[in-house]
């Protein structure tokens, strides 16, 4: 697969809280780091996303009396999570082992108190933009390659919204890890297939 100057690598949420020992660890989450390092040199454009929640964020189960992490919010229907990636904390920091000195942007998401944000393109209300589409258009980007955490949530929804926003999207499967709550990996893969988002291996780049 040929990588050009109109492609960008999007590294999603490789943060301490999503890695082993964190507040919301994705199994083997830190295993994506060497894969990302191996492919980063192929890309002229590298962008990072960072979950960045205020204390008491609406996505936290602790903000909903009587609810537990991984319950569904009966009002929004969205998954509730343990407190994680609280702005300014160690857990919210990009994992120290991830070294991408050429990264040109860190896009923070989930910082609005009453709206969660899985996607790098839109908040979960599906209308509030996070700015990545405008950034890509201003720089003439055409195709986004996605890696990071978690495959079945923030990576997958970012790839779907890239397509929705008029870009091509590719998910680098071995550069991602998923949580897989209630079949969420299979559900995400079905959505990606319907949207025409290919899954590739890093060796194919």
Model-flagged regions — what are they?
Residues 2-9:
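Extreme N-terminal starter segment of soluble prokaryotic enzymes
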Residues 6, 43, 102-103, 166, ...:
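Short, well-ordered alpha-helix to beta-strand connector turns
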Residues 12, 50, 173:
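Active-site flanking residues adjacent to catalytic metal/cofactor-binding acidic residues
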Residues 22-28, 120-124:
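Short glycine-enriched, charge-decorated loop/helix-capping segments at active-site entrances
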Residues 34-143:
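Active-site alpha/beta core segments
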Residues 36-39, 153-166:
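Histidine-anchored nucleotide/phosphate-binding helix
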Residues 170-185:
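Short, flexible loop segments at boundaries between secondary-structure elements
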Residues 198-205:
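Short acidic-hydrophobic, aromatic-tinged amphipathic segments that line or gate anion-handling sites
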């Amino acid at each position: 697969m040929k990588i050009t100057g109109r492609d960008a690598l999007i590294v999603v949420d490789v943060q301490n809280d999503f890695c082993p020992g964190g507040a919301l660890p994705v199994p083997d989450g830190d295993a994506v780091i060497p894969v990302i390092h191996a492919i980063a040199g192929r890309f002229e454009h590298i962008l990072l996303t960072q979950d960045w929640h205020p204390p008491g964020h609406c996505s936290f189960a602790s903000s909903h009396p009587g609810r537990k992490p991984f319950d569904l919010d009966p009002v929004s229907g969205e998954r509730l999570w343990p407190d994680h990636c609280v702005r300014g904390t160690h857990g919210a920091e990009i994992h120290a082992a991830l070294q991408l000195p050429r990264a040109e942007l860190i896009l923070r998401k989930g910082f609005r108190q009453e709206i969660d944000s899985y996607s790098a393109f839109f908040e979960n209300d599906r209308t509030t933009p996070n700015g990545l589409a405008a950034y890509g258009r201003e720089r003439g980007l055409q195709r986004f390659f996605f890696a990071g955490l978690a495959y079945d949530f923030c990576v997958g929804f970012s790839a779907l919204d890239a397509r929705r926003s008029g870009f091509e999207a590719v998910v680098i499967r071995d550069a991602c890890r998923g949580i897989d709550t209630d079949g969420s990996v299979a559900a995400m893969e079905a959505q990606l297939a319907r949207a025409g988002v290919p899954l590739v291996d890093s060796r194919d780049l």
